[in-house]
Amino acid sequence: MSQTNPKVGIVSLGCSKALVDSERILTKLRAEGYDISGSYDGADVVIVNTCGFLDSARAESLEAIGEALAENGKVIVTGCMGGDEKAIRSAHPSVLAVSGPHQYQAVVEAVHAAIPPLHDPKLSLVPPEGLHLTPHHYAYLKISEGCNNSCSFCIIPDIRGPLMSRPAADVLGEAERLAEAGVRELLVISQDTSAYGLDLRHAESTWRGRPVRAHLTDLASALGELGIWIRLHYVYPYPHVDEIIPLMAEGKILPYLDIPFQHASPNVLKAMRRPANQEKVLGRIRSWRETCPDLTLRSTFIVGFPGETEEDFDSLLGWLEEAQLDRVGCFKYEDVKGAPANAFADQVDEDVKEERHQRFMEAARQIADERGAAKEGTRIEVIIDEVDEEGAIGRSKADSPEVDGAVFMNGETDLEPGDLVIVEVEAAEDYDLWGDVVERLPPPRPRR
């Protein structure tokens, strides 16, 4: 009787960058003959890819490790919290191995030790685009690791190291393989997307027979040749971001920018060790919208940062009203083990954080309501994410998966995930839209 391939399960916690790490680990293991299990009891060993950014995330990671141990018994730990092996083994001494973020080979070797592969590697087991944990029609494209910033509330540089960009040809080759495999949307991610290529001194590499610089503008322009949706995340407002907006106006990449502004008060931004000229940023936002009227701006903010006064918070609300951001997320400040901000004076009370968070999100909701109402009666392009007996759910060019709004098409049951359609918007509420399909679009075609 032939033996069955060993099976590996994975629990992936945290951000989209960690999800890409999980995909790369699974791709390596699949190439060596391992099968992937979607359940604890079906796996011979379970990998837990942890998050270690916030204290609450560390607690969630420890809880997930404990659950995996209870349900399976054989657990390998990796990811951002993996750098603190002492804390992990103190809570869970029976884990098989612990490694830090993007240490793919260490994880593979730990799996080998727990349950060896049955045969030599066979790359034919893996599709050219690798294995992905997202739906088939979209994928994350990680262009760099690490970060060179020194924000006082963050320990990412300590966890993931300094900026390490991938050569442009490497990124574009992966993107091309994904597009050829049927991916309709690529979400470009990193810790600091605008800094892409700085560590490489923007060196050129060859793609499609021509040189392409490791620079965000050049990369975005080249990605636009694939003919699919290209969405930029984690874009810091460096001056050269102005060069990206015309590409959006031309339709090469989606008119969408995810920029983590974090705050607007100069005092708070200085304490955060972030750029503090938000008045200048307002001027740039106006200029961007003049160049690309359809531009969607998403951002995240932190309220209750140590030393944040009521005046600072009011400044943030005023700036938000002027900026008229389309999509907004907000976090209540919490300590991060090892971050300088932990030791700052004038920590804000939890009830004050909660009250400010509610006020901020209400202000953001009112802006979203007004901007959403302006879309009623218009026609927008939508990518389909889900279809069931009640209808279809998709996203517009203004909506990224998981974090933004959705477009609901009641009664549209003959669509499939990944389809592109034109929807006439009938109603809007908060970040969501409702409407009817008026046209089906053909599959995208690469631009050669």
From Swiss-Prot:
It catalyses: L-aspartate(89)-[ribosomal protein uS12]-hydrogen + (sulfur carrier)-SH + AH2 + 2 S-adenosyl-L-methionine = 3-methylsulfanyl-L-aspartate(89)-[ribosomal protein uS12]-hydrogen + (sulfur carrier)-H + 5'-deoxyadenosine + L-methionine + A + S-adenosyl-L-homocysteine + 2 H(+). Residues 133-371 form the Radical SAM core domain. [4Fe-4S] cluster 2 binds at C147, C151, C154. Residues 6-116 form the MTTase N-terminal domain. Its cofactor is [4Fe-4S] cluster. Binds 2 [4Fe-4S] clusters. One cluster is coordinated with 3 cysteines and an exchangeable S-adenosyl-L-methionine. Residues 373-439 form the TRAM domain. It is found in: Cytoplasm. Keywords: 4Fe-4S, Cytoplasm, Iron, Iron-sulfur, Metal-binding, S-adenosyl-L-methionine, Transferase. One of its GO terms (cellular component) is cytosol. [4Fe-4S] cluster 1 binds at C15, C51, C80. One of its GO terms (molecular function) is 4 iron, 4 sulfur cluster binding. Belongs to the methylthiotransferase family. RimO subfamily. HAMAP family: MTTase_RimO (MF_01865). PANTHER family: RIBOSOMAL PROTEIN S12 METHYLTHIOTRANSFERASE RIMO (PTHR43837), RIBOSOMAL PROTEIN US12 METHYLTHIOTRANSFERASE RIMO (PTHR43837:SF1). Catalyzes the methylthiolation of an aspartic acid residue of ribosomal protein uS12. This is Ribosomal protein uS12 methylthiotransferase RimO. It comes from Paramagnetospirillum magneticum (strain ATCC 700264 / AMB-1). The gene is rimO.
